[in-house]
Amino acid sequence: MCGIVGYIGTEQAAPIILDGLSKLEYRGYDSAGMAIFDGEKINTRKAVGRLKVLENLTHGGENMKGTSGIGHTRWATHGAPSDINSHPHMNNAGTIAVVHNGIIENYIPLKKKMQDKGYQFVSETDTEVLAHLLDYYYKGNPLEAITKVLHRVEGSYALGIMFADQPDKIFAARKDSPLIVGKSDNGSFIASDVPAILKYTRTVYYVDNQEVVELQQGSLRFFSVDEEEIEKQPVTIDWDANAAEKAGYEHFMLKEIYEQPKTINDTISPRIKDNDIVIEELNMSDEEIKEITKIHIVACGSAYHTGVTAKYVIEGLARIPVEVDVASEFRYRDPILQKGNMVIVISQSGETADTLAALRESRERGFKVLGIVNVVGSSIAREADSVMYTWAGPEIAVATTKAYSAQLTALYMLAMKFARVRGTIDQEKFAGMLTDLRCLPDQIELLLGQKEKIQHFANRYVGARDIFFIGRGIDYAISLEGSLKLKEISYIHSEAYAAGELKHGTISLIEDGTLVVALATQPDLFQKTISNMVEVKARGAFVMAVTIEGNKAIEKASDYVIYTPETNPYFTNSLAIIPLQLFSYYVAVGRGCDVDKPRNLAKSVTVE
């Protein structure tokens, strides 16, 4: 959510900042801006709309000369998208510039105090109060001014700051919003995420909570909010910039759909040894696993949907009760956590604000937390007691595909590990499931071969008004994700329902021609699901079914059927989701939607 890029060095800053911001477009934004120091003063340019507008306004940065600057893509929280509300924000004298991700929760009383002191506000944002506070406290010592401001503000922030009378320095600070800094032979960098600066350096430092960084051309210095200097170790990024490029695909989303076989294999391979599942990073003894009395899974969006699937899989295999919570609800409902409970948080970015808050709440109450994340060094990865990385590589499209599949795979392996240790499945069943797990990448390749068939069908529903997804058990979990994929990238109203709930109200919405996507991958629920399909078909619905090979009985209750390869019933989500991802993608493309960057959405939701 929003993006920050900063640079100070020997090169022209504006083109580097624009390039970096372009690598952060996946985070979601509605406007963009830059501040560049030209040797005498700080110049700013802002523009509502796509980054291209700012690029055109500045001729690719060529008409903003200077070797230090900060840039920002804004996702509106306080104040509508506008040039005035766009970042950077300045003090009244134009000598201090600030870019900010996050929310200053006490900005209203702070704003009033600054207005009472004569400061003039021009925007509706919470960020502008930072610029005026910095001006108020600045007496020639930037670090002192920044730390005084940080002691007064409440909320979350990632900051990039410039002072006109400090031409050889820029500053960064962080609390509860992601931020990294990096260094190369040609300068130093600030960024919200690695892809923004990977073209220029592989050496990065993760800024921790309530830390301030002073960046100069050849050096980085780290400080606490109490101005104590901190020693930090760099991290070398081991994937290259090409992994974050389209590689010939029309969209990142399509590329990432096709990367799922590799993603699943990369998640599985390091954790299978001698026909057993070994999760060394779990840091739990067999005795500790046996003592688990309940698991709480906490996540948001698609990650929450993987948690819903995991509930069925873990309860079915390991016989451990599982509760799944939307992260934004978890911490506010005063959850009952008892001895023997385990908390699992799931997040692709490792920076999801609500999930991070749930992690901290759980740890404060004395419970160990396992994080399932994709981004190495992210906040959740650093703060969780143990971490399972999904090794999906960079996922650029806002709508998750391969990270979702990797999360599912990690959860399958966790469930199987727990079941084997607790003795709730025998060796024969475990070995069979391990074989099925290893087959998933090849089976997904087969499903991807049906692309043209699915595209042809999707083109028929480009103009749909409503689409419903139904399923039972694990199929309900698949329905949740299929519906979310469709609505977030095509803007078609879509809902997912437990199939048995249709008759309790939702069936009144079915009319002639309404598309109902029915998931039927669970053999013990086939007949019940078919009954629900017949009910909607009798009311004029067009029924698209997704089921496993051999389930020919479903054809009489369907108008269109997609068959997936046969696998263990607990793993069907990984296969059934593929045609739903492709269907959503081609509907969105047919409607002319911005598939990789849907309106109003952000890849990493870093505010609560």
Question: Model-found features: residue ranges?
Answer:
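Hydrophobic alpha-helical scaffolding
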Residues: 7-10, 100, 120, 135-139, ...
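Structural motif
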Residues: 68, 96, 294-296, 342, ...
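Active-site phosphate/pyrophosphate-binding segments
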Residues: 260-264, 268-296, 386-515, 588-608
